[in-house]
């Protein structure tokens, strides 16, 4: 018989009552529980293309900024072409899975789900993207692909329609592969000096966060939160990221590019009882407001970066997909809310697809 000291009994009771809550299963934001929009029984004109060849080779790719100076802001057309060619199968997988999952969540056609599972299963069985021979561009592709795949997977895993219920063996194999990729991503992006931590680290943290929730891995969740805090504390009082200001004419574009992963991480953290909104005096809010102001009038970015800004990316609506999680965190009003509505829907394969359906499912009815 176990004897419990009266002094320790209350503590043990508290642990029993609240300890489980502290380690509750990880969950995504509420929108990921949405079911299939309108179930269609036939396969329609959907045809499953053959899965792209699993990429198991060396992750050494040319950078599209090859030959550029330290600012890494001048595009090398020949290098970009070589990069696109060598990473084509990876990008085809990312975009294809995102598209098929989106189609399935809209129409519920079994062939759409089966095809997405076939593609992911083919790569999982090959243990693709796990090469230990990589350069910076290669490890960047690994984490981008993981974020795309895990982000899409969350819509299947948590949907009230339970599409994976009849595919548990396949799902387990795919999720184990995601977990291996996430563990490697943690190794790839850990321990960097502050001057080397920029948007790449934030995107790595997003991929790990998405995988943490998909696989219920608290260690991965904690790492993503830790990396988020590093990023948030890089935002200065005026809302600038010093390491992105180094990108010269693309400083504003890279500030904008840093926002999607940070906003998604904060949103996922909040869903699990970790409120990151106030980190570094509301850094994420400050960063977003600065980018929105810069998109209207880039003069402050021009002054801080020391060169006129390239606004090409700032004219593409999908580049503002971060507004969905950001507005869910900070409750946008007025001009910001109007701008968000004007640009919806937001579809970003690197965030797992249609983020408007996740965060603002009634958006279409507002138009």
Swiss-Prot record:
One of its GO terms (biological process) is alginic acid catabolic process. Pfam families: Alginate_lyase (PF05426). Residues 1-24 form the signal peptide. It catalyses: Eliminative cleavage of alginate to give oligosaccharides with 4-deoxy-alpha-L-erythro-hex-4-enuronosyl groups at their non-reducing ends and beta-D-mannuronate at their reducing end. Substrate binds at residues 63-64, 136-137, 254. Keywords: Lyase, Periplasm, Signal. One of its GO terms (molecular function) is poly(beta-D-mannuronate) lyase activity. It is found in: Periplasm. CDD domains: AlgLyase. GO terms for cellular component: periplasmic space. Its EC number is 4.2.2.3. InterPro entries: Alginate_lyase, Alginate_lyase_dom, Chondroitin_lyas. Disulfide bonds: none annotated. Gene3D superfamilies: Chondroitin AC/alginate lyase. Its main location: periplasm. Belongs to the polysaccharide lyase 5 family. Catalyzes the depolymerization of alginate by cleaving the beta-1,4 glycosidic bond between two adjacent sugar residues via a beta-elimination mechanism. May serve to degrade mislocalized alginate that is trapped in the periplasmic space. This is Alginate lyase. It comes from Pseudomonas entomophila (strain L48).
